[in-house]
Regions:
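Repeated loop/turn-to-beta-strand initiation elements of outer-membrane beta-barrel proteins
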Residues: 20, 57-61, 102-104, 150, ...
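Outer-membrane beta-barrel "beta-signal"
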Residues: 27, 150-156, 185-209
Length: 209
């Protein structure tokens, strides 16, 4: 009973301050500046929570805490393989309320890498995991993002977003890195689709359309 009361005391002020909610969806991620290899999108997931302070104006804001699995598939002259990366992401967006049902998001994000896996497959079909793959990647990432979000009814939301990383994915062009690059200027792009639910009453926008 005490735990329930404590949870109510913690959550209620958040509800009065703004809308909190949950969201989950799919990631389609890839890399850029990789002329030495062929690469393709890798599908992952995103799941997390958000806080959107209440606002009746056209401009509002939204902060999220997201667990995001992303990466890419690659192909060289001799091997192909995958890279899987797991991040904790902290995006913050400026929300433009076109109507009470439709928002445009523009903002930035930071991310911290908590796990990394990579492998390579030879022409013979044998797959070799990369030992201690985390050592090759930069832990911190940052970039810009933008997208749209629809609020069709009640607490439901559906959205899409594009994130462009400004940080190098790899620390350096280290020997033994899989796949290997002549330059470390490799960056990530991430396209997300998601759905979610926000709790608390949605404030009416000054734009009543």
């Amino acid at each position: 009973m005490k735990k329930i009361v404590l949870c109510i005391l913690v959550v209620y002020p958040l509800l009065s301050f703004g809308q909190i909610g949950v969201k989950a969806g799919l990631n389609f991620s890839n890399v850029t500046n990789t002329s030495s290899i062929s690469h393709s999108n890798r599908t992952g997931y995103n799941i997390g929570i958000f806080l959107a302070p209440k606002s009746k104006s056209i401009i509002s804001s939204k902060t999220e805490l997201i667990l995001s699995k992303q990466g890419y598939n690659y192909l060289t002259n001799s091997v192909d393989g995958t890279a899987d990366l797991l991040y904790i992401m902290l995006p913050t967006y400026l929300c433009i309320n076109i109507t009470r049902f439709f928002q445009i998001h523009i903002g930035a994000q930071m991310a911290y890498l908590i796990n990394a896996k990579a492998d390579s497959k030879t022409a013979s079909g044998s797959t070799s995991p990369v030992s201690d793959a985390m050592q090759y990647y930069n832990r911190f990432d940052y970039g810009l993002g933008g997208g749209v979000e629809i609020h069709p009814f009640k607490g439901l939301l559906v959205g899409t977003r594009m994130n462009i990383s400004l940080a190098n994915l790899y620390k350096d062009a280290a020997s033994g890195q899989v796949p290997s690059f002549a330059s470390v200027n490799v960056k990530q792009n991430l396209f997300q689709i998601y759905t979610g639910w926000h709790f608390g009453k949605q404030p009416a926008s000054s734009n009543k359309k």
